[in-house]
Amino acid sequence: MAGAKEIRSKIASVQNTQKITKAMEMVAASKMRKSQDRMAASRPYAETMRKVIGHLAHGNLEYKHPYLEDRDVKRVGYLVVSTDRGLCGGLNINLFKKLLAEMKTWTDKSVQCDLAMIGSKGVSFFNSVGGNVVAQVTGMGDNPSLSELIGPVKVMLQAYDEGRLDKLYIVSNKFINTMSQVPTISQLLPLPASDDDDLKHKSWDYLYEPDPKALLDTLLRRYVESQVYQGVVENLASEQAARMVAMKAATDNGGSLIKELQLVYNKARQASITQELTEIVSGAAAV
């Protein structure tokens, strides 16, 4: 059994670590609330854009934009949103596993996959497993802006415009609540039709000013940008929630470990006292 001094040192070490994890839990909780506010502020715009685009997909358009037309699939692209930092449980790896499973279904059909990464964890993971990373952006911090995301989005849209991509998806974690974050893969292009049953039984038509091409070119790019930005802010809220839960679990585990070490320390101290008493009694008997 380890000596009492060594056990006391271990207890002190765990207590110091526990203070750090508790502080990180509190910081993550504060950042999560701010991330939720940003997510709530941008969500109505993203959802409204999705509805408008859903209407367009069902509409009888006088100008058929390339983003509305299905193609034979030879290559697909994924905009993958991950975190820049770790210590957030299985948030990233669960997302990567889901993406790898989907990519396998494409490669089994001889379809190639391109990846545009947002977040350093995704970059390092897919570089290590041999993914075809064609664009990346990292280090956006806790308050990302759309201008920082334009690079990877522009690369993938250009590839789609030039016919080098036939489908485009966004991969991110959807924030449900503090305890639940769901990895999701959503199709961006070609434009997915709305799931609203009312729209499926209506024939939509529009009048465009100044002209359909100019309006749709701008609107559809804004749609893609809005969905990517919403994916990033939801993933950020998911990251802070997962980190808060992970740090709370670490703090609780530290408390359990301290109790176990305290019990071992008490036993070691009791054994030491018993040994000293035995030696005293033995010495007295010898005299």
Curated annotation (Swiss-Prot):
GO terms for molecular function: ATP binding; proton-transporting ATP synthase activity, rotational mechanism. Keywords: ATP synthesis, Cell inner membrane, Cell membrane, CF(1), Hydrogen ion transport, Ion transport, Membrane, Transport. GO terms for cellular component: plasma membrane; proton-transporting ATP synthase complex. Pfam families: ATP-synt (PF00231). The keyword Ribonucleoprotein does not apply. Belongs to the ATPase gamma chain family. Produces ATP from ADP in the presence of a proton gradient across the membrane. The gamma chain is believed to be important in regulating ATPase activity and the flow of protons through the CF(0) complex. This is ATP synthase gamma chain. It comes from Shigella sonnei (strain Ss046).
